[in-house]
Structure formats: structure tokens, C-alpha cells
Amino acid sequence: MKRTNVILTFFALSTFALLTAQGIHAQQAAYTLKATPKTVAWGYYDAKAAPVLRIKSGDTVQIDTLITNSPKRLEAAGVPPEQVEQSLRDITEQVKDKGPGGHILTGPIYIEGAEIGDVLEVKILAIKLAIPYAYNAFGPGRGYLPDDYPYAKMKIIPLDAQRMIANFAPGIEIPLHPFF
């Protein structure tokens, strides 16, 4: 399921504690990190990847995330073309370095002052659905039962952002409550 426009606040706890202890009140900033061909990794995060955004402890970041599927497959499954995000089209066409996983990951984000071994606190302040659908899919040789299904299938699941539910099937509504 796609959740987007996640607003996060990052805290480098050791740095935050140090600044507070010294009575320094750093000015907090707010950023927006869009999912673009230059700000995503497809299928993996490389520890050597350069950060696409640098922030300080206490800063707020609104992060756009994307559904992990191709526009062609989504449209073939019944998603109207106007509901497929342009950023997904751009990333699908332009990102050539794709790892073994299927997920499109926005980032990485570098937190100034954070060091190896630090504990980072991330607060998710809000989640807003960017598209009115999710999907579930399987294919041969994939998933938990790779040998049981020699064919592929994808189900588009309509989302109701007002009620925060997924209309999985007639009479089956799944609440869209985050796990945190």
C-alpha cells in the first residue's frame, strides 16, 4: 500500500541532548523531499550513496514516497492513467540502477552531527494518501508460496482517504491505521 507525504522529525539524540545541555536553541527548519529520479534508490540502499538531503536534529521533513509498480502494469490492472503519478512515470523511465528489491526508496537523508552508534528518534507526524488505490500482487517464483502459483495476478484496492479504509472486496473494509 502506498503512503505518501510522510512528515518526519529527525532527532540525533546525542546532539540534541548536547545542545539542550549547553542552552543552545538551534533554529529548526522544514524541508520537502520529493520522489524524483535523483532522490530515490530502486530496490536497495547503498551505504556509500550520497545523501539527497542534509538536515539538523529537530528539523522536519515531508517525504514523498511512491507505489512500487510500473505505470504500464498499474494501467493494465485498471488504474486510470491520470491516477498514475508523473513522478512514478519519470522514475520508471529514468532510473536504470535497480537493485534486487522492488521498492522505490526516497533518500537517504543525512543528519548533521549524528555519528555511528547514535540512536536516532524519528517521529512520524502525519500520513496523507497521495493516490486513491493500493495493490497486491504475486507472480511465479515469488512471494511466500512461489511454487504454488505458476501465474501472475494483481489486485487494485480502492482507498477511501476520508474514511481511511481500503475497500478490499464487497463487504470487506480494511482500516488504514499505521502500525506506529
Label the model's feature ranges.
Residues 54, 110-113:
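Residue-level "contact hotspot" at macromolecular interaction interfaces
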Residues 9-20:
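Bacterial N-terminal signal peptides
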Residues 36-46, 98-106:
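Short, structured beta-strand/loop micro-motifs enriched in basic residues and often containing a Trp
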Residues 103-104, 126-180:
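Intrinsically disordered, low-complexity linker/loop segments enriched in Gly/Pro
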Residues 21-28:
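Boundary at the C-terminal end of the N-terminal hydrophobic targeting segment
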Residues 68-80, 127-137:
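Short, Lys/Arg- and Gly-enriched loop/turn segments at beta-strand edges
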Residues 63, 119-122:
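A generic structural signal for residues embedded in beta-strands
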